[in-house]
Amino acid sequence: MKVTDFDYALPKERIAQHPMEPRDHSRLLVVDKHTGAMEHRHFYDLPQYLCPGDLLVFNDTRVIPARLYGYKDTGAHVEVFLLTRLNNTDWEVLVRPGKKLQVGACVKFAEELSGTIIGHTDFGGRIIRFAFEGVFEEILDRLGEVPLPPYITAELEDKERYQTVYNRDPGSAAAPTAGLHFTKELLQKIKDMGCEEVFVTLNVGLGTFRPVTEENIEDHPMHREFYSVTPEAAAAVNRAKAEGRRIVAVGTTAVRTLESAGATGAVKAGSSWTQIYIYPGFQWHIVDALVTNFHLPQSTLLMLVSALSSRELMLHTYATAVKEKYRFFSFGDAMFITTLLNSKKEISCTQ
């Protein structure tokens, strides 16, 4: 398939620059992945499209203040963007300007934090070894900036609005944005109706924004991300699958985690790197339904949601969303790609 097969026209004004307040007042486009039936609702209506026994899987990662500013011994200013933690002191990073930061270069960020470039990565980045006094996470909170996606140009007043309400595992360079719509009250309502929830962790990297540069989508080199699944989460998912209950992934990062850990048909507990690449023709093992935002044209995430339904249905759904003036991308509205919508566009848990 060609990357242009996943293109669509999006007016610039449809790109959301600010998060919706309250969180769950975003709009929700519900679409049946088999029939194409659609419903236009708000996110607080999501429980109406869930069934008792559904298992919702959330990514509990937290976005870190990944952008650091420092200077070399020469006084030259540099920018370091944290991507992946390798151990207590070493990180894979992006640097700017790259030519000024070769192996051996030292960077001073503050009195309590400095770093030395010790290697190159296979994606044009660097490996930096930090030296610090105190707790690294606390230093990072003081010195770093939380990065926003490049298509968001407005200033974000409350940085917690780029975090989910259930975040607890720092490590991401970008938010798992489907989760931004949930409030604590909505989560409780979903639990009270008999749904189950579990949490997995995938540290979202900047690769999530990397454009597909190859003409044929099959030739695209997929970025890697680190994920973790606890034994309790794996057991809950496998039990739900065995009992015929729906697995509802909250966000594409939850999808990547579940389908990576469940590549053999059953989810395995543990931590690992994944370069899973999901596009039409993918053989699904775990995920039945998906809560997700609207994704960029020609992106791997648009390919992923197309794999769960079909390319034609997703492009039709996106065209409908543009026409109906939905808000797009990280701070935008949401979709629920599901099953069980009957001819009246109502949920039918007994189908």
What are these regions (language model features)?
Residues 1-351:
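Surface-exposed, charge/polar-rich loops and edge strands
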